[in-house]
Amino acid sequence: MTDEKVINKKLVGDNKLFRHQAKFVAGAMDIKQLPNFALPQIAFVGKSNVGKSSLINTICNNKKLAKVSNTPGRTRQINFFNLVDKLIIVDLPGYGFAQVPNQVKDQWEILINHYLRKSDNLKLVNLLIDSRRGIKENDKKVAELLLANKRDFQIIFTKSDKVTDRKNLNLEAQNFLATLNYSCNLIYVSSRSKEGARELKTSLAKCIKLEK
């Protein structure tokens, strides 16, 4: 068996990890509450109402895991989910919601910045962007923050079932990444149609495998 076939076989095996249900294990609203897990962590971050909770539920095979709401700004803490003691999925608070008080926004920023700087086991961040809206200024700032903290990330375009023209969106993403001198995966996902779910799971499994 060739090395490539061995790698692909291992990735398929790791992909089966996501057939299990993840469980909520901790929530942190301030720095003191941040848990210290020895397991590898993969985080999800995006603008409020980008579809983050729905995607996490799909990835973790648990429809009730992350609370899904039509109200932006619902996720107000960092939530940690344990996937059969193999992986920690991290749900970061959404950004860019104008109705959240400035004091709360400041608290979120401090909390998220600290987590990104100090988490030794954070292997990858998934930057979620609404494919209908394109890359906004807040998204760019988060990408810059991730690179400033030397965090690998990939771009996940959500709600892909509602968009037909992806050529311009891909070009926009590539042009932005070029300004950062960075390259990464661009994955289109839809929690409704399940498009991209397998590709995303495989990318996460590959990330964990490379870190072993």
Swiss-Prot record:
Superkingdom to which the source organism belongs: Bacteria
Function: Necessary for normal cell division and for the maintenance of normal septation.
NCBIfam families documented for this protein: GTPase_YsxC
Cross-referenced InterPro entries: G_ENGB_dom, GTP-bd, GTP-bd_ribosome_bio_YsxC, P-loop_NTPase
Domain (EngB-type G) ranges: 38-210
Protein name: Probable GTP-binding protein EngB
The keyword DNA-binding belongs to this UniProt entry's keyword annotation: no
Record: residues binding Mg(2+): 53, 75
Gene label: engB
